[in-house]
C-alpha cells in the first residue's frame, strides 16, 4: 500500500456521451440519449451497448419467452426453450443469465416509479409496464437466487439443458408468488 494512490474519476455527463455518440458514431439522437443513460457515465459501456445490440436483442427475446412460458405453464415449450439455450455455448449462457439478473433488478425497481433509477432500453421499458408487477418483494430474492444458482451450475459445467429446464420450472412457482 505504500506506493498506491487512489484517484476518484467522476462520471461523464449523459449529455456529453450522447453528443459524442451522435457526432462520432452516427447514432440517432433518441437512441444516443437512451444509450447514454444506460451507460451510467461510462463511455466504454456506451460503446459496448452499441456493439452488443444484436446479442441483447436475442437475450431480451429469450427472457420474454421464458417469462411468458413460465406464466402460462407451457412445459413442452419450456423444454424447447431450454434446448435452444443449451445450444448457445457456455459464455453466452452465462451472459444470458447476467442479462436476466439485470432485467429482474430493473423490473423490481420499475415498480418504485423512479425513472432515473431504471436503466432499460425502450423495448425493455415497454415490456416492464406489463411484467414489472410480477416481480415483487415476495419473489425477487428467490428469482435472483435461482439465477445465481443456474449461473454457478453453468460455470461448473453442469448439463445446460437440465439447468435451464430446472430454472424455468422454478420460475413457474416464483412468478405466481
Language model features with spans:
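Charged, glycine-rich active-site and insertion segments that engage polyanionic ligands
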Residues: 1-99, 103, 110-177
Amino acid at each position: 500500500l505504500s506506493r498506491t494512490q487512489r484517484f476518484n474519476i467522476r462520471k461523464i455527463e449523459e449529455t456529453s456521451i450522447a453528443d459524442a455518440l451522435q457526432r462520432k458514431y452516427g447514432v440517432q439522437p433518441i437512441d444516443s440519449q437512451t444509450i447514454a443513460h444506460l451507460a451510467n457515465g461510462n463511455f466504454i459501456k456506451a460503446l459496448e451497448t452499441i456493439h452488443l445490440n444484436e446479442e441483447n436483442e436475442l437475450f431480451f427475446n429469450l427472457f420474454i419467452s421464458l417469462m411468458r412460458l413460465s406464466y402460462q405453464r407451457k412445459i413442452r415449450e419450456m423444454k424447447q426453450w431450454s434446448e435452444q439455450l443449451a445450444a448457445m455455448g457456455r459464455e453466452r449462457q452465462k451472459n444470458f443469465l447476467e442479462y436476466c439478473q439485470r432485467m429482474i433488478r430493473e423490473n423490481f425497481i420499475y415498480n418504485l416509479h423512479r425513472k432515473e433509477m431504471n436503466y432499460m432500453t425502450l423495448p425493455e421499458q415497454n415490456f416492464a409496464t406489463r411484467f414489472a408487477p410480477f416481480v415483487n418483494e415476495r419473489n425477487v430474492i428467490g428469482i435472483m437466487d435461482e439465477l445465481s444458482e443456474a449461473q454457478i451450475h453453468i460455470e461448473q459445467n453442469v448439463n445446460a439443458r437440465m439447468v435451464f429446464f430446472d430454472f424455468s420450472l422454478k420460475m413457474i412457482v416464483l412468478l405466481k408468488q
